[in-house]
Curated annotation (Swiss-Prot):
AD domain mapped to chain residues: 79-173
Function noted in UniProt: Nicotinic acid adenine dinucleotide phosphate (NAADP) binding protein.
Protein name as annotated: Protein LSM12
Domain of life of the native organism: Eukaryota
GO MF assignments: RNA binding
Signal peptide (from-to): none
Gene for this chain: LSM12
Lineage: Eukaryota, Metazoa, Chordata, Craniata, Vertebrata
Record's keyword annotation contains Mitochondrion: no
CDD domains noted in UniProt: LSm12_N
Amino acid sequence: MAAPGECFSVGSQVSCRTCQEQRLQGEVVAFDYPSKMLALKCPSSSGKPNHADILLVNLQYVSEVEIINDRTETPPPLASLNVSKLANKARMEKEEKLSQAYAISAGVSLEGQQLFQTIHKTIKDCKWQEKNIVVMEEVVIAPPYQVENCKGKEGSALGHVRKIVEKHFRDVESQKVMQRSQAQQTQKESALSS
């Protein structure tokens, strides 16, 4: 293990030997003293240039640590965060989770919830209105959420939503067929091995 009071500066070059006798060498990107966790930036294992591996090393399982090059100057400043972008993303995530919770509490079928998620991936302007899915304030999809349940003013919005619903159910059906054939294959294999 590393020496009891040892700290590592960000940017320092460190070499260590793990309990599995593996030699690791890299640049310190973070060090948490209470948990004795060291994050090292090492050359990419894939060999790709401009790529690196980040390894988390628990110093409690390291037999030897050597500081090859200690960084004495102050580390570069942390990258700035776009706080408004993060807040917007958090707000959207919250709205999405509340929408899912509403659908569950309203007793919407699993198929309806899955269709809503599929539509929402393509068209963000969709919401629940009781058990109905409302898309772009123009198209309403009522239970059981099939193509024929899509109602609205004839036009491109209605046609586009119908295509999404159609494709969703085609994909669901092909997934069911694939699962059935895999289950049958597994049954055949287990019957042959018995």
